[in-house]
Regions:
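Divalent-metal (often Zn2+) His-rich catalytic cores of metallo-beta-lactamase-fold enzymes
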Residues: 113, 137-191, 195
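Metallo-beta-lactamase
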Residues: 48-95, 100-101, 109-110, 141, ...
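Conserved beta-strand hairpin/beta-sheet module of binuclear metal-dependent hydrolase folds
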Residues: 1-7, 104-108, 112-118
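C-terminal regulatory/interaction regions
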Residues: 188-226
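Active-site environment of divalent metal-dependent phosphoester hydrolases
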Residues: 23-29, 48-52, 100-103, 121-125, ...
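Active-site metal-binding motif and surrounding structural segment of the metallo-beta-lactamase
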Residues: 1-42
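Divalent metal-coordination and catalytic microenvironments
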Residues: 22, 34, 41, 77, ...
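Active-site neighborhood of phospho(di)ester-bond hydrolases with catalytic His/Asp-centered motifs
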Residues: 16-24, 42-45, 114-117, 149-150, ...
């Protein structure tokens, strides 16, 4: 199907601007066909850096090939960027390294909507991309940043999971911090990764471990970063 028809299936109005919240394929995979339909692509500068070259992600045991020219962001920024569209102000802000080194938040100012990208997974364990700057400590730091930026009325859009609110951000931070503390203690006591995977997150596994990030994989990333 032509890209224009695909875009029209999303919105009758033309899409003029596409924002990438970070470089991963599940957040940039539509770049080329949305660009073909007339949109320009905006991202943090590290997103373009990773998309321009073959990028290895050890956590997935996969090397992602460089993106085609039409998928490369044409406008990039370092720390902050403000965009005005449809009578709305969008405030973009780069995080310190968290899920990756390219993560940004997008605040829809007038609507009080806050999009976190993959610095927030609502009731799902997150993937942490150590190969491109991510870490469990960075993910927790970003969670703290997100909590500080919203009110009880803010609508929070995660990178994965259902739309949430401040309480969900707090829960996510607490789950990550609790897992990190338990894993760090076990690692300091000399426990191996295999031993650590034996259920320090059992309390949250039933609800949080049903996404593509299993409890074992999540604990592997936590263990790596402690």
């Amino acid at each position: 199907m032509p890209s224009g028809r695909l875009v029209a299936g999303i919105n009758a109005d033309p899409i003029k601007q596409l924002i990438n919240t970070h470089w991963h394929f599940d957040h940039t995979g539509g770049n080329e066909w949305v660009h073909e339909a007339g949109a320009s692509i905006l991202a943090q500068e590290n997103t373009r850096k990773h998309l321009l070259i073959d990028t290895r992600v050890e956590g997935w045991k996969h090397t992602f090939p460089a993106a085609p020219p039409g998928a490369i962001p044409s406008t990039v920024f370092a720390e902050e960027y403000t965009l005005h569209a449809n009578n709305t102000t969008l405030a973009l802000k780069h995080y310190l390294p968290a899920h990756t080194d390219s993560d940004i938040s997008v605040r829809f100012v007038e609507a009080d909507v806050f999009h976190t990208g993959d610095t927030f997974w609502n009731r799902n364990y997150p993937f942490v991309d150590y190969s491109t700057g991510g870490s469990i400590d960075g993910q927790i730091r970003a969670a703290e940043t997100n909590i500080a930026k919203v009110t009880d009325k803010t609508i929070v859009i995660p990178g994965h999971g259902a739309v949430g609110d401040k309480a969900d951000l707090i829960m996510f931070r607490d789950v990550l911090a609790d897992a990190r503390e338990k894993v760090a203690t076990m690692k300091k006591q000399g426990h191996s990764l295999t031993e650590v995977i034996a259920k320090p997150t059992a309390r949250t596994d039933e609800e949080w471990g049903n996404g593509f990030m299993t409890p074992a994989l999540f604990l592997q990333w936590v263990y790596q970063g402690t």
